[in-house]
Design a protein with these regions (language model features):
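Short alpha-helix
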Residues: 182-197
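A short acidic, Gly/Pro-enriched loop at the edge of an enzyme's catalytic core
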Residues: 118-126
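Conserved Class I S-adenosyl-L-methionine
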Residues: 202-266
């Protein structure tokens, strides 16, 4: 599975900002370009506050990408974070950036499928941003999340859910774009958490908010086309443009919705 092309493009962006390969990098600067979810560190600060992540927290992140969320959480709170990412190239770059940011004493990167990840203990928090719907076998991974949490531990997730039906002639393209291996309806989403022993404390429905974000992101990306292609080439631009435009369309046409959810192990 490769949602985004050329994970090395983040290193190109750092060079364009005058930061050489292997040079130290500040989290505050890195966080402006290493976030793969919606609304960047503002979304992470909401999670930190509402899920009450602090210096004594032990956090497991599922689907860590470049490690941007893990670094921000560790930097802002002092928490220890285990960052699990299935894509080897993203994990490799993520762990390198974590070391360059001086956070490798707080963050452990693991290149693994979450379903195969061996739990070595329990966590106060499990967090995930726009990753859970990619993982197959939803009952199994929700059960594993519950197993990973200590008693009264907290799950915080931003995720997609299925909304209006996707036309049959568009289903193949939709699947290729999203890898929606466990995309379920909102009712099914809540029921699955309950069945896994995770009781919902609060939810926030996000489709209008994220729909606006994805549309604005596409427009801004296209406005910067010349500069982006100069750094990364036209093939990378075209691949990202198709993805960004497709996501904006999926929200606008009601094929997907989005939510924030806070749940606690019962």
């Amino acid at each position: 599975m490769e949602l985004y092309p050329r994970p090395e493009r983040l290193l190109v962006e750092l060079r364009a900002r005058g930061i050489a390969d292997n040079a130290p990098v500040l989290v505050e600067m890195l966080s402006k370009i290493d976030q793969l979810h919606y609304h960047g560190t503002a979304a992470l600060d909401i999670a930190i506050e509402r899920a009450e992540i602090g210096s004594a927290s032990r956090v497991l992140e599922i689907g860590s990408g470049w490690g941007g969320c893990a670094r921000w959480i560790a930097h802002r709170t002092g928490a220890s974070v285990t960052a699990v990412e299935v894509q080897a190239d993203y994990d490799r770059i993520g762990r390198s950036l974590t070391a360059r940011a001086g956070l490798d004493d707080r963050i452990m990167h693991v290149n693994a499928d979450f379903l195969d990840f061996q739990l070595a203990g329990t966590y106060t928090h499990v967090v995930s941003w726009l990753a859970l719907f990619h993982i197959p076998d939803r009952p199994r991974y929700l059960g594993k999340i519950a197993d990973a949490l200590e008693p009264t531990g907290v799950l915080w997730a931003e995720d997609l859910y299925a909304s209006d039906p996707v036309p049959n002639n568009e289903r193949a393209a939709f699947n290729a774009r999203l890898f929606p291996n466990s995309l379920v309806t909102l009712d099914e989403y809540s029921a699955g958490l309950h069945q896994a022993g995770l009781e919902i404390v609060g939810t926030e429905d996000m489709p209008q908010y994220w729909g606006h974000f994805t549309a604005t992101r596409t427009a801004a990306f296209r406005a910067d086309r010349a500069a982006f292609e100069h750094r990364h080439g036209s093939a990378t631009f075209e691949a990202l443009d198709r993805f960004y435009d497709g996501m904006a369309s999926d929200f606008a046409r009601g094929f997907v919705g989005g939510l924030r959810v806070l749940a606690r192990k019962g």
